[in-house]
């Protein structure tokens, strides 16, 4: 991955977190952005948010215009990528893996 793309994703992550915290919706402004992945042409960004509620995606879709406007004003960029919000389930996967490893460890202890 090139340094420019990494820097863009890092800046976008910070700006999106600020944008969400500035919204008047308590569900949205308490969300955490865990990761941002930009497309090759940097015209599209996949934004991973930490939430268990699938309804939050429709709220984020409705607020996308405000969020993009905030990013443009705060960054001074000429253009903001189109945003696609995705629920980040990596924590859930990690917890499942931990449970599996604990079961394996218990099985070895019993032997």
Curated annotation (Swiss-Prot):
Keyword annotations from UniProtKB, A to Z: Cytoplasm, Ribosome biogenesis
GO annotation (BP), single: maturation of SSU-rRNA
Highest taxon, organism lineage: Bacteria
Xref: InterPro entries: KH_dom-like_a/b, RbfA, RbfA_dom_sf, Ribosome-bd_factorA_CS
Gene Ontology CC terms: cytoplasm
Pfam families: RBFA
Cellular localization per UniProt: Cytoplasm
NCBIfam families membership: rbfA (TIGR00082)
UniProt subunit comment: Monomer. Binds 30S ribosomal subunits, but not 50S ribosomal subunits or 70S ribosomes.
Task of the protein: One of several proteins that assist in the late maturation steps of the functional core of the 30S ribosomal subunit. Associates with free 30S ribosomal subunits (but not with 30S subunits that are part of 70S ribosomes or polysomes). Required for efficient processing of 16S rRNA. May interact with the 5'-terminal helix region of 16S rRNA.
Stated family: Belongs to the RbfA family.
Protein name listed in UniProt: Ribosome-binding factor A
UniProt source species: Helicobacter acinonychis (strain Sheeba)
């Amino acid at each position: 991955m090139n340094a420019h793309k990494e820097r863009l994703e890092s800046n976008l992550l910070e700006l999106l977190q600020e944008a969400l915290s500035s919204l008047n919706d308590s569900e949205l402004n308490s969300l955490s952005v865990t990761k941002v992945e930009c497309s090759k042409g940097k015209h599209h960004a996949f934004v991973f948010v930490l939430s268990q509620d699938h309804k939050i995606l429709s709220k984020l879709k409705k607020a996308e215009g405000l969020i993009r406007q905030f990013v443009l004003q705060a960054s001074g960029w000429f253009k903001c990528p189109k945003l696609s919000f995705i629920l980040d389930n990596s924590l859930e996967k990690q917890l499942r893996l931990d449970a599996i490893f604990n079961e394996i460890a218990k099985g070895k202890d019993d032997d």
